[in-house]
Amino acid sequence: MKRIFSTDLPDKLPGRLVLFASSILAFLAGTTVYLLGRDWATTQFLSPVSAWQPELQVSFGFLGANLPSLCHAYTFTLLIILALWPARHARVTGAFSWLFVASALECLQAEAISDAVVIGTSWFVGSPFADGLLAYMTNGHFDVADLAATAVGVSGAFVATSILEEKT
């Protein structure tokens, strides 16, 4: 019977499952910090359900502001790398693609950039994509620490997959 996948798949499967599990744990940790440490009324996708926010609001300090960005970057970079894994340059492609996307979305929240995008997208006002993008830019705020957390999360996923590749 001819194999569809790479011949080394069964040997590397346990390590890939560990990486997948670590991405899920990181996602849950980031989501927990995000939900417990932020005001839902000021969060774009949570504002419709802000009345349901628990009264207990935990302060995570510096971690509360940037841990969700780090976990988000780690999780999505790792999932992209795992999805591309049989490809020769999966780690580099996955890491740089998510770093580009996350950094671009963060930079869109910078006032100078968002002002230019608002002017450029004025023709498309009323379309769901343009309205969503404009709401994201105006409700969010640019934070260099989020860019740094994204870089650390992407680097962590890159290193984790590098270690797996060396061990198997």
What are these regions (language model features)?
Residues M1-T168:
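Bulky hydrophobic segments
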